[in-house]
A protein has these predicted regions:
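C-terminal structural segment of proteins
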Residues: 1-248
Length: 248
């Protein structure tokens, strides 16, 4: 890293980010593990993007909001129960979650991301500086570019949601992640750490375990594709039971 810039506007940040050797930083939890050379790091912390605000119909989650803010926000808990606590509590520790950002977790589209898995089963949109508002399910399929993720917009639409994961130890990377939500008989099921970025499918409560079989599973040091496929059915079954019994 040669230069550090804290821009005063999103336009300034966007212009700086058009150079391939420059990089926007969130909490710098994962970027420091990379091997690439970075000329200029762009810090968005002075742009007021670190707040979670609530209206009657939705939440606006700024890209610089931390994972610990997700975990402890009273409005999110009132609306979604323990959903956000469950999708964050295994991520290293509180000190780490106080630094890691929501924007970095989503924009990075990491294969191990608990956060991406969780947001995919809510009515979530991303607001990009140039492209505008895009459904998260579309965003994850878009080519990577030099745009800036400003915020997430999450609808308060009355859906119930549950989050589950399988890990070798409490704070290890997940072997598999699973989130599900139900509204008016329609279920959204997301499975991640397969070991590839999370994806989402629409199904019903009765078909959740079969829907888990439609995802592609692969192998790495944490488990085989066959094992992950088995886990997918198990976690989908547990999510189904939680949704049916209202334990969310």
């Amino acid at each position: 890293m040669k230069n550090y810039v804290k821009p005063g506007t999103l336009e300034e940040a966007y212009e700086l980010n058009q150079k391939r050797a420059n990089r926007i930083i969130g909490g710098m939890m994962w970027i420091r593990m990379g091997r690439g050379n970075v000329n200029t790091v762009i810090d968005l912390s002075g742009l007021g993007l670190d707040q979670i605000t609530e209206t009657e119909t939705e939440f606006h989650i700024g890209c610089m909001s931390t994972l610990h803010q997700l975990e402890t926000h009273s409005g999110l808990k009132e609306t979604f129960g323990d959903f956000f606590k469950e999708c964050t509590r295994h991520i290293v520790g509180v000190q780490f979650r106080n630094g890691a950002t929501v924007g970095g977790s989503i924009f990075g589209r990491y294969g191990f991301s608990d956060i991406l898995t969780a947001f995919l089963v809510l009515d979530t949109k991303v607001k990009l500086y140039k492209k505008g508002i895009v459904p998260l399910s579309e965003f994850i399929r878009m080519d990577r570019d030099r745009d800036i993720l400003e915020e997430l917009i999450v609808a308060k639409d009355g859906r119930k949601a549950v989050y589950l994961s399988e890990r070798r130890s409490q704070t290890d990377f997940p072997v598999l992640t699973c989130a599900a939500s139900e509204k008016d008989g329609t279920v959204l099921l997301s499975i991640g750490a397969r070991p590839m970025k999370a994806d989402v499918t629409e199904t019903t409560l009765d078909e959740m375990e079969q829907a888990a079989d439609t995802f592609t599973y692969g192998s790495n040091m944490r488990g085989s594709g066959e094992y992950r496929k088995h886990l997918g059915r198990v976690l989908a079954g547990r999510a189904k039971k939680a949704l049916e019994e209202g334990n969310v």
